[in-house]
A protein has these predicted regions:
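A residue-level detector for the "anchor" residue at the start of short, highly conserved motifs
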Residues: 1-173
Length: 173
């Protein structure tokens, strides 16, 4: 949620879900993204914020510098190609990450490299607003590479997954 016009000395938005930001520098008016789990303060940068749940919440920095904080932990300052995420106890953890999936997300693609099938299907289910049910639990942790356009239909993504010949995905309903 963000206003049509920012007022006062801060530019504040509230986020549930995921968003990519390309923020113009303005030292006198910091840009702040607030989620249920943390607050990100920037002066001018490119970054991605994901806030779906406590265990699926992180800030990934593409360019510039941001500070991430919450009530449970000291603030973390991120450099490009770093990510702040929440631990199970609500603390913040910083780690180096590959930013390519976030660039592709911004360009309209799902991009998974060495990602477990369960994570891929969770993301597809969220995007297409469908429930995903696994009948073969043995494949949940199978790691794979998969790329698909977010503008294509769910059927298109399913056909591409099935073309890999490793497992079979069906659509019901």
């Amino acid at each position: 949620i963000f206003p049509d016009v920012f007022v006062k000395e801060q530019r504040i938005v509230y986020l549930k879900g995921e968003a990519y930001f390309d923020v113009a520098p303005d030292k006198e008016h910091p840009f702040i993204v607030k989620t249920d789990y943390f607050e990100t303060v920037v002066l001018g940068t490119k970054f991605n914020v994901r806030s779906y749940s406590k265990l699926d919440a992180h800030v990934t920095l593409l360019e510039g510098k941001v500070t991430v904080a919450n009530d449970m932990a000291p603030a973390l300052t991120l450099q490009p190609e770093e990510q702040a995420s929440l631990t199970e106890d609500g603390m913040l953890r910083k780690q180096a990450v590959d930013i390519y999936p976030y660039l592709e997300w911004q360009n309209g693609y799902f991009y998974f490299d060495n990602v477990a099938l369960v994570e891929i299907m969770r993301e597809l289910g969220r995007w297409y607003n469908v429930d995903v049910v696994f009948e073969n639990d043995e494949m949940l942790d199978y790691k794979m590479h998969f790329v698909a356009s977010r503008t294509e239909s769910l059927m298109y993504a399913v056909r591409n997954l099935n073309a890999l010949g490793i497992f079979y995905v069906t659509l019901d309903g």
